[in-house]
């Protein structure tokens, strides 16, 4: 288990939690003073009231909650959102309402989940040619349905 330091930005903030022993993500809660009405086909930035610190071997990914997506057509817009190891500001979640009905966000509503994920850094090596593959340059549906 990797250690993540967490700072409450107000005493009444609810800390993220794993809801089951098998959960890979901790639920993030909205920390808002007034209800947010998320209109259809619109986005909003929802504060969580927390900031974190962790090893640079990791990132935290912010992902949608499947229940919000399936039942309310609401998801995290920049999925997955990335919290870099050197970011110390408040975690905020960009929610998007894909549906046709308004979506109400109240304080302490579970709005997303965060997952600690290992990061493997790339070493780029410039080249004039790349190795051939069967697929080649085919993309965007080139392998069939």
Regions found by a protein language model. Name each.
Residues 1-145:
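DUTPase catalytic domain/fold
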